[in-house]
Regions:
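Short helix-capping/hinge motifs at transmembrane helix termini and TM-loop junctions
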Residues: 77, 103-107, 177-178
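Alpha-helical membrane-inserting segments
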Residues: 27, 31, 35, 95-99, ...
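Membrane-interface helix-boundary motifs at transmembrane edges
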Residues: 6-12, 74-86, 151-159, 201-210
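Membrane-embedded catalytic cores of phosphoryl/pyrophosphoryl-handling enzymes
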Residues: 122-212
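Residue-level signature of transmembrane alpha-helical entry/exit and packing/kink sites
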Residues: 9-17, 21, 84-85, 163, ...
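N-terminal transmembrane-helix/juxtamembrane module of multi-pass inner/ER membrane proteins
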Residues: 2-68, 105, 112-118, 122, ...
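Aromatic-anchored segments of alpha-helical transmembrane domains
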Residues: 25-26, 93-101, 165-175, 218-221
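Interfacial segments of alpha-helical transmembrane regions
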Residues: 16-17, 69-100, 163
Length: 221
């Protein structure tokens, strides 16, 4: 029995984790490439934000976001929750990328690659991620969703506190690495709240696969 449960769990991770990564990466990079060829962009930041100093070592927290997502998919306790989490991340990605296409942003910071000790990380980041998929920040949205899914798995307060602290550090990192502005962070949290409330929690309460399917269809009607 335990072997069968483990087998189903690993199967859900492989199928839904792979589908989620493929969907989100392809959609984000495609949107990024399209928007990079636009002629006009929206500036949704305060001028005073441009005076915020860059803190190079915060890129370590910025990149740790990928680890948080990985852990959330691997550590949630049931195949059903893995499916709920993956679908929520994909819906969030679809909503965000639609906004990126309709309202492409312009970042107020000047990008610098020659940062001693972190050159390769910043160079790779700037090559892959063009400065227009800004709001909502998917770093914020995905981190919040992932942390929430993990928090729902346990009642350990210390674990909850560490996850919340991790999300806070990622939130600080997106602006201290000069990748996002305050508006991007705020809208990232808003998108996370919307998709957690109307997608993740709905899916978690619908245990039957047919109820899951009907719930997703209803979300888009």
């Amino acid at each position: 029995m335990e072997y069968e449960k483990m087998k189903e769990h690993l199967k859900a991770i492989a199928i839904w984790g792979s589908l989620c990564v493929l969907f989100c990466v392809v959609l984000y990079l495609s949107t990024n490439s399209i928007v990079d060829n636009f002629n006009s962009y929206h500036r949704l930041y305060l001028e005073c934000e441009k005076d915020i100093p860059q803190v190079p070592w915060m890129i370590l927290f910025y990149e740790s976001y990928y680890l948080l997502i990985f852990l959330s998919i691997v550590l949630v306790k049931s195949p059903h929750s893995i499916r709920s989490l993956s679908i929520t991340l994909m819906v969030s990605s679809a909503i965000a990328c639609t906004i990126f296409l309709l309202f492409p942003g312009e970042i107020g910071f000047s990008r610098t690659d020659n940062i001693q000790g972190f050159e390769s990380l910043f160079e790779a980041l700037h090559i892959i991620d063009k400065p227009h998929n800004l709001y909502p920040s998917l770093h914020i949205t995905f981190s919040t969703i992932s942390a929430f899914a993990l928090i729902k798995q346990t009642k350990q307060k210390l674990f909850h506190a560490l996850l919340i602290l991790w999300v806070i550090m990622i939130s600080l990192s997106v602006i201290l690495t000069h990748q996002h502005h305050l508006f991007d962070i705020a809208t990232g949290f808003v998108l996370a709240w919307i998709t957690l409330k109307f997608v993740y929690l709905k899916l978690e309460s619908a245990r039957h696969w047919l109820a899951n399917a009907l719930t997703i269809i209803a979300l888009f009607l």
